[in-house]
Amino acid sequence: MKALHLQHRSPTSYRVKARASYVDETLFGSPARTRPAQPDFDPPWVQNCNRSRGVGPGPPKGSLAKRDCESPSSRGSTPNLTPRKKNKYRLIGHAPSYCDESLFGTSKEGSRMAVGDAAKLRTLFWTPPATPRGSHTPCPRETPLRAIHPAGPSRTEPRVTAGSQMSSQDGLCVPCSLGQRRSHSLTHLTVPSTGHPASSAPQTNGPWSPRPNTSGATVQSPLVTSKACSGRVSGPAPPRRGACPPKPKPPWK
């Protein structure tokens, strides 16, 4: 009960009576007694030392301005002609911004955008590049591929066509596309590793060998089929690049 009594009494016992401020008098009216007049302060951008507006009869205005310009802390130690130290936080100049013009209107000199700042503001915005990225123009890394690809088939096409005609006469399979011809040529290189001797590799590869085969008889492997042997023994045949490689039989058959 005692604690509750103290809580009930605490707001009234510790209340501080505040005097009516200037804001209270402006909003809610002045109290019974009259309040002294507020001093008339100059705006911060006015830099004059003459503050003798409401001064009555006395010394001349020049002496008052001279006395006001002196700092109170330096009157005793320094001479009287020392000027007052400048306040570094005083607002020297202010150019109206976009927010100022939006809230308070344009100034008398003219709008901020009419002075010539519109051209400067355009450089702040992002501008798209001259060539759009979604166009059908080829990428720079695709151009060397276009220069390399046509040169490959033009050199090897006459030999491939001649070899395909001869292979069709012998009854061997003929590939249809250049990609298959290249894959078959790679299989020719891998055939000697399965069981052929190293000496027969340049003879069976056709155009891959440095010297063409002049003699009709060749060294035959036991794994080569009879159909492929009959084609070799018949005579010196032109190199066939597109012919299918013979499938070797395993030794246990």
From Swiss-Prot:
Cellular-component GO terms for this entry: centrosome; cytoplasm; nucleoplasm; nucleus
Gene name linked to the record: Rita1
Main location: cytoplasm
Stated family: Belongs to the RITA family.
Protein name: RBPJ-interacting and tubulin-associated protein 1
Alphabetized PANTHER family for the sequence: RBPJ-INTERACTING AND TUBULIN-ASSOCIATED PROTEIN 1
Region of interest (Interaction with RBPJ/RBPSUH), ranges: 112-140
Task performed by this protein: Tubulin-binding protein that acts as a negative regulator of Notch signaling pathway. Shuttles between the cytoplasm and the nucleus and mediates the nuclear export of RBPJ/RBPSUH, thereby preventing the interaction between RBPJ/RBPSUH and NICD product of Notch proteins (Notch intracellular domain), leading to down-regulate Notch-mediated transcription. May play a role in neurogenesis.
Classification via Pfam families: RITA
